Amino acid sequence: EQLMTPKQVKQFTDEKECDFAIGVPGIGRFRVNLYQQRGSLCFAMRAIPYTARSLAELELPTVLEEIALRPRGLVLITGVTGSGKSTSLAAMIQHINENHKANIITIEDPIEFLHRDINCHINQREVGTDTATFGQALRRVLRQDPDVILIGEIRDLETLDAAVKAADTGHLVFSTLHTTDATQT
């Protein structure tokens, strides 16, 4: 309970599971999934670096540098759980931040990497804290004058539809999809 906000505690009480991120001073940041099984508390944690690594540090193809600086479009990073989708997106946002001027708005559940403004103005919104749902945030994000929109994960058709519409209206949209192989993508 000490690591969770009152809203997260209520969500866990009501739904018996909750996702959130925590920072432990001197140790690091973690993405946490808290859940119940057979009446006991369980959790899974993943370490999140304090700063996003560069595309070069991740040894990702250099074409991603060009894609990250495009003026519009929809960029999907796909793969299985734990394959580096969020890390890759964070590196692309960092590349934009270092090499371009833009208004970037992220919608995440939870916020994982914390971005610091360099050349860009970056607003990071967390589902459940700063907005009710991905869909609600995406319906309103276009009024916030974004150049770049990052959607932490496309989980449903409403979010997918909103992502495509945002890209169609001239924005650069990044997101992730869980897939097991190329044909599923």
For the regions a language model picked out, list residue spans one by one:
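N-terminal "pre-motor" subdomain/linker immediately upstream of P-loop NTPase catalytic cores
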Residues: 1-80, 88
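Aromatic/hydrophobic pocket-lining residues that form π-stacking "cages" and hydrophobic walls in ligand
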Residues: 32, 92, 137, 162-163
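Conserved P-loop NTPase nucleotide-binding/switch module
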Residues: 110, 142-185
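P-loop NTPase switch/communication element
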Residues: 65, 69, 75, 88-145, ...
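Conserved NTP-handling cores and scaffolds of large molecular machines
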Residues: 3-8, 38, 52-56, 71, ...
